[in-house]
């Protein structure tokens, strides 16, 4: 098997540079485009060129490299190797360690027939903004329409695990929406932004309509909000919901369901916060049979050491703690399916 470092991949790079050419003379966008560059476009010579492609964005840095590895591995293990090629767009800060990029590239040898990886150096893209409360990495995908030359893309946080193939999700109808997301019952921004709770989505799992965002030039509004507003409780999530409202669609609940305690927990949280267009039956079915599960409800995060996790889990009551511990071990089992479990166990002090 021969490894290809395809900075000369004409098909993708031609599209990339054509898109870059459109925006390079734009006074607002030019400073951002100057920061972004492709590190490499990689695949093996065994890649099936005629497969359908699913484009996925992942933000990462040195701190979250292992959670990113586990998330990506779960996607690839559950993809349909015979029909689908996963094209991963990995958005990295300028200071990410080369050895961590190489760890991600090792997936090319494990899944040689159905994986491409494109690594982007995002430079110091968001240093210019006044709001430094949140990690810059979280904001990278907000500008993906100006440098990723495809029609649509899935975005996944690193605390998301897959249990099914994502081809059906990827080809969902946008119905003229900018994004499709998982209906978030913890809708922090609804009240003070005047949004409707039945349209407020979590930003950890998204299907993004890059073509429509480019057509309507919504990136200008994104940049304006980043530069002028400081009071977002949920940073990039609030921006996405505010800028794209009301053209926000709801994903089937199986794509992005949270790691709730149980069915009673689901009913309590959703009925308390969302009054319209609520399909509890679908949400409960998704909880029992998820395609993508977002591990949002564990504090500390599910990947921390067994003893720390059990001791410091902030879930209330015996049921809450037991639930969190259950999800902790689900994540560990997924980590064991990677080539880096020894490193992961050492890093997070997992026994």
Positions of predicted regions on the chain:
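Conserved donor-nucleotide/metal-binding helix-loop-beta segment in metal-dependent transferases, i.e.
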Residues: 162-192
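The conserved acidic donor/metal-binding loop of glycosyltransferases
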Residues: 157-161
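Active-site-proximal specificity loops/subdomain of glycosyltransferases
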Residues: 108-146
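Short aromatic/hydrophobic "clamp" motif used to bind/position activated sugar donors
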Residues: 153
